[in-house]
Amino acid sequence: MIMHWEVKAMKRTLVWLLVATLLLTALPAAAEEAATSDVYRTLYSGEITTLNYLVTTTTNDFAISANVIDTLVEYDRLGEVQPSLAESWSTSDDGLVWTFNLRKDATWVDHNGEYYANVTAHDFVAAAKYILNAQNASSSASILYDVIAGAEEYYDGTATPAEGEEPAPVMEWETVGVKAVDDYTLQYTLKNPVPYFLSMTTYVAFMPVNETFLNEMGANFGVATGNDTILYCGAYILSEFAPQEKRVLTKNESNWDADNVFIERIEQTYNKEASTISPELYRRGEIDSASIDSTLAADWLADPETADLIRPVRQSGFYSYFYAFNFDPHFDEQYEPENWKIAVNNENFRKSIFHALDKISAALPYEPDYPETILFDTITPPAFVSLHGEDYTDMGALGEVTAAAQFDEAKALEYKELAIAELTEAGATFPVKIYMPYNPSVTGWDEECQVVEQQMEGLLGTDYIDIIIEAGPTTGFLDAVRRNGNFAIHKCNWGPDYADPNTYTDPFYDGTYNQPQMALYYNNEEGVSEYYALVDAARAITDDLQARYEAFAEAEAFLIEHAFVIPFGFGSGGYDANRLNPFESQYAPFGLSGERYKGQKVYEVPMNTDDYFEAMDAWEAERAALAAQEE
């Protein structure tokens, strides 16, 4: 049996001795100020659609869950795994069985902070059983049944068969590899060894739920009508919730780690114009956070009264943004969906668009000074995972992708001419209407769309394409646009759930983003989507990490080389106005860490640019010291 936490704890003790002096001498100016407020105030314009963390995988929804529900483990501010609801864990010698020993002082409370029950291993079993019931339509189900023994067979047995299909055998829950050995010992049995399994447990799919409360609530569990439809075991309680009015998170005094929760109250006020009015409210001291677009950032930096109020945005996560072509359009007839189907199924048409996009120009609304720093040419961001010193995005077929220029005016025009001939023969009409909605609550997205429209129509010609940009709703945008197929081309994003390239196949493999499996002409001899076949082959490799990574690289390269998507980069850059120190937040490229307020403080004096880079240097030095100690 391999014991994990105890060994790492001894190493960390030595590391902290090495960095203690560094911490004392390299604290940024903002960190030297005492926290003068227990309250953190923000505006928001997109309301949550559910509090049911067992079904949602939407960032806007689970940003609340991350703060009110704890996970088995968590990441600290340096990206190191720390115990949370699990005090320790171990792995069997064959890597198939993971055992978690839960703390006995973790409790469930209601929205008033009143004790309900202790958190036990049975709560994790109840959550898995709920997620793996196909009737509950959980977006997290595949995360569990991809790795847990017996989970997929159980899930299939709960599903309603399609017309003409035989139902799958109904399986007993005991065949699934999720087990409460006793009240405080939880065990997962996997299909195959999964080296990154621990990182998976920080995601919503592995959160617990109290089964008694779940059964009492029935279909009302997690309904986003109030704060009394879930229980709480995390750092905060959603003490007030009036949809499209306000949300208030209050420190959970019963939480096992309450001493490390420094912000007592988080006040989030709804305003559909939040992105527009937040900067001025921040300047007046009425709120504590505001996104600053590129135009305003230039003005503030030039003004001595505001120059010290903003700092660069920290790129703390690995959310990847990419333009996706929709192969199953469901938009209004005025945008000619049938004509779009003809066009999008022509590879030369897609490649003309692919090579016509000037990403540097499109990124200027987010990062006006160094736009190239937030851009990359793959779906998986660089530095996400590596092996033997080689970055995954440089491996195999992806290495060829990153070596080639994507914005290429000559190629765009060459593919345009090929597409015109083929599309004319296929019965398409010109210009091809390209419906491209955006979320008005996202700072800079409207400006980006305008830049893209002008730049691409200017290059390819308005006799070839007609890009139509339109503001979508601020609340329920994902449901109204992407999930309904209500777009021709759409800038989508995906954040990793665990530390393996497989996580970046999820939006394409299940077809939820742009339905690549419905593209014509890309099935193999067995009638299976070529992309699906490549992903299946990569997922089947569990004993050779080099071969596994190279196989996933081939699958990802397939999407890019055939222009199913246009890789973009990170979603933000530029500047932020905020009274939090971003280097105090939990850090991990996956899971929920980036959404948590635990460990952070509200400062009277916000970071300026100099403070930010000083803090970043200190943080990177601490990370380097840890890495050196662990080698």
Question: Where are the regions a protein language model picked out?
Answer:
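Aromatic- and charge-enriched surface segment that lines or borders ligand/interaction sites
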Residues: E87-V147, Q187, S278-R284, N339-N345, ...
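N-terminal lobe/hinge region of extracytoplasmic solute-binding protein
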Residues: L43-D93, L231
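Short, well-ordered beta-strand elements
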Residues: T36-G46, V97-N101, F124-A127, L186-Q187, ...
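Ligand/substrate-recognition segments at binding pockets and active sites
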Residues: P243, T402-P496, L545, G573, ...
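Detector for C-terminal structural segments
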Residues: S352-T393, G444-Q454, A480-E631
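Gly/Pro-rich hinge or "lid" segments in bacterial periplasmic/extracellular proteins
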Residues: A159-T175, V181-Y184, T189-E267, S275-T276, ...
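Alpha-helical secondary-structure segments
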Residues: Y116, A121-A126, D183-T189, P193, ...
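Extracellular/periplasmic solute-recognition and catalytic clefts
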Residues: S239-T250, T269-Q334, I360, L364-Y366
